[in-house]
Amino acid sequence: MALSWMLLALGASTVAGTAAGATPKPDLIVTGTKPDRLFIIDASTRSVRAEHRVPGAEGQIFTIIISPDQRTAYLLVDRMERIVGIDVRSGREVFRADLSTPQERVKCFFAMTISPDGKELIVYELPTKLEPSEYVVEDPRFAVFATDAGLSAKAVRSFTAPRRVHTLLARPDGRSFYAIGFDLYEYDVRSGKLLGTRGIQHWQIPDHTTPDLLAFWPVTEPTGIFTSPVTTEVKRGSESVPTTALMVLDLKSGDLAYHDFEPLSALIFSTVLSPDKHHAYGVYTTLTSIDTVAYRLERRIPLDHTFYDINVSSDGREIYLGGTNCDVAFYDAATLEKKAILKLPGCSDQVLSTLRVIHDR
């Protein structure tokens, strides 16, 4: 299917070159499925552009990180013990880092990110030393890999990390990155110095109990802003009312805010912000639209089944759903009307794979 991609790209470039004005290039959706497939989907035609086999996946694809030039997809695979880089067009493996060794079993629990210049991967590692008679749990760490290291990449440096981290997000200036866990941590990417800690579980919001969030999906496109639903209880007199808030983190400015928007916990998984930043969309057993100007629930519809992951088109007109089963769903962003369902070839399960949006080149 790589050949068909190249022919389509050649045709598209020829048409673009002869047209009077440039037309927006279509969104491409990137997702992974069991046991070892990476799919590139043309959102404009609701069709699979390419299907790549991922070497060494060993059953499942978890987190997907896209390089800044959008040419390489970095995939967490093999029971969270290996990271591979796949050329999006050709399907060729261009990077591999085996995290574990015979002496140490290392897991990356979803959390990894890439530097804005595309030169380094930052990976959250949970190591366990394999002794002859016992397993010794070691301290978590951040490991940094050079993306040009080929198929035998080793960490070029590492530094101590907190426990219970599940999302890493690089800041656009390349100097630091965020780690989301019990709290929001910021680290210097070169020295590993902790630059600051802000509250998530330790937030200081009057009349709110300790919050909870499940932020496994590091989606920040197209705005550069990370959002996640946060569940808590708000004390009203003698009662406590279950409430959902939206966590909003601007990666460029560093601004962090929480906004209550509904008095129940129907939304617990991923959210994404619209390009105009006036709406957020969330998914679980329902599809939810949130007004992010007034921070109120706009509308909600039931879904055919649970979806774990959500993204939005670059023009803000469509919502993309995935992360479970073998279907990717397309919904109208304004009305939440279902527009199409794409069943992936072989109907293999996406499980917890990240749903990413890139652009045709």
Predicted regions: what they are:
Residues 13, 17-361:
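Predominantly soluble domains enriched in secretory-pathway, periplasmic, or organellar proteins
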